[in-house]
Swiss-Prot record:
Enzyme Commission number(s) from the entry: 4.3.2.1
Protein name: Argininosuccinate lyase
Gene it is expressed from: argH
Residue stretches spanning the membrane: none
Top EC class for this record: lyase
Biological-process GO terms, alphabetical: arginine biosynthetic process via ornithine; L-arginine biosynthetic process
Subcellular localization, as worded in the UniProt entry: Cytoplasm
Domain of life of the native organism: Bacteria
Length: 462
């Protein structure tokens, strides 16, 4: 029985062994085992409801399916290449256990709509789990921001010191990225949440089935509208892969920042030993391997998205075997992003912030130059003129090896007579930060508002 092809009636010879090996997806789609069982249970209930099979037959099939699932979880189901795919494995196991009645499970169904159902069930569950991981990470970031709310650091553009900002403001930028990721996943969920079952091979079925009953049983909001589209559609997987690529990209940017900030050249942060490794030859090394892996794995997540896009690029309607390739892309990306989210959350929870080095780093690089230009504007100087004047002042400071704070009032007045004693208070780093009260800015007041808004956002999702 185990070597039987359930579709072999039309064929006069067995498939080649090398083709069996090439064709089989069982070692990949075995991850869909439980979803396939749940889909079959709902399908059989519908067949009985519509008087396509008897109630006693449905009960026997359903009881056996649940027992097969239990045995699978206990490791009692043996499978291999000859089983071809997860659908055939389960159906053969069912027939082996209950005989002729088991052969009725596939009535009014094709593997084409069956696998689409399994994948939608899988994506829904994984989507919800990813949402929870992101919520957890946003909470961790919010806590880190609150604990270091008034720590000042340089903000960077072009990897050069630009303007002083609060560390809390900086780290909350990643919370905003993750917020968008969360909203994107929620949209993905709604796009996935339509039941494909009942579309059969491509044209629907001649049996008088109730697709809406199956959808309700499995918690879908609706049913798909066109059977040809349904069995060939993998948009919901593409959208999931795009969302995963975006998430991983955001994590990669954070990883890159922290890799830089963790160096001796910056010393803004210190990574916990538990997320670093050493060198096989250099005894002094403490390498940020966890962050580097998050950064490195971004490439494979991108590749999964591009891979499936390429598979779908030239497919004619409707179903084609090419679609079997979608699962490796999907499973790989989900596992990679899940692990990355978990790891980076733990890194943030164990992170040490070097407040002194951060604020000391603000003393060089003329990061208060923009504020000096703003000061001149308050004295009636047009901004473009103020920009030019401050550019000359910075050039003078570089040549004189001075900071803006080092200049005397007399030196300032060489460049602009409107500069007064109050300039020194205006260009203090703390003043530079806390004057930026525009909505979404880096002032303490603004950052507190950002934290409150994030908490409110997360609470509304509960």
């Amino acid at each position: 029985m185990s070597n039987l092809k359930l579709w072999e009636g039309r064929f006069s010879k067995s498939t080649a062994q090398i083709f069996d090996l090439f064709n089989a997806s069982i070692m990949t789609d075995i991850k869909l085992f439980e979803y396939d069982i749940l889909g079959s249970v709902a399908h059989v209930k519908m067949l009985a409801k519509c008087n396509i099979i008897r109630e006693d037959e449905a009960k026997l099939i359903i009881d056996s399916l649940y027992q097969i699932l239990e045995d699978f979880k206990l490791g009692k189901i043996v499978f291999g290449i000859s089983d071809e795919d997860v659908h055939m494995l389960i159906e053969k196991e069912l027939i082996k256990r209950i005989g002729e009645v088991g052969k009725k499970v596939h009535t009014a169904r094709s593997r084409n709509d069956q696998v689409a159902l399994d994948e939608r069930l899988f994506c829904r569950e994984k989507n919800l789990y990813l949402q929870e991981l992101i919520k957890t990470l946003i909470n961790t970031i919010t806590t880190l921001a609150e604990e270091n709310i008034d720590v000042i650091m340089p903000g960077f553009t072009h990897l050069q010191k630009a303007q002083p900002i609060l560390f809390s403001h900086y780290i909350l930028a990643y919370a905003q990225m993750l917020k968008r990721d969360l909203l994107r996943l929620r949209h993905n969920y709604s796009m996935t949440n339509s039941s494909p079952l009942g579309s059969a091979a491509l044209a629907g079925t001649t049996f008088e089935i109730d697709r809406f009953f199956v959808a309700s049983e499995l918690g879908f909001e609706s049913v798909t509208e066109n059977s040809v589209d349904t069995v060939s559609d993998r948009d919901f997987i593409l959208e999931m892969l795009f969302s995963l690529a975006m998430i991983q990209m955001h994590l990669s940017r954070l990883a890159e920042d922290f890799i830089i900030f963790n160096t001796d050249e910056f010393k803004f942060i210190e990574l916990d030993d538990s997320f670093c490794s050493g060198s096989s030859i250099m005894p002094q090394k403490k390498n940020p391997d966890a962050l580097e892996l998050i950064r490195g794995k971004t490439g494979r997540v991108y590749a999964d998205l591009i891979g499936l896009l390429t598979v779908l690029k030239g497919l004619p309607l409707s179903y084609n075997k090419d679609l079997q390739e979608d699962k490796e892309f999907l499973f790989d990306s989900i596992e990679t992003v899940e692990m990355s989210l978990i790891v980076i959350n733990e890194i943030l929870k164990t992170l040490k912030i070097d407040k002194e080095n951060m604020v000391n780093s603000c003393k060089s690089g003329f990061i208060n130059a923009t504020d000096l230009a703003d000061y001149l504007v308050t004295k009636g100087v047009p901004f473009r003129d103020a920009h030019f004047i401050v550019g000359n002042i910075v050039k003078y400071c570089i040549e004189s090896d001075k900071t803006l704070e080092d200049l005397s009032l007399e030196e300032y007045k060489r460049f602009c007579e409107k500069i007064q004693e109050d300039v020194y208070q205006f260009i203090k780093i703390e003043t530079c930060v806390n004057r930026r009260k525009s909505y979404g800015g880096t002032s303490l007041e603004s950052v507190r508002k950002q934290i409150d808004n994030l908490k409110e956002f997360l609470n509304k999702l509960k």
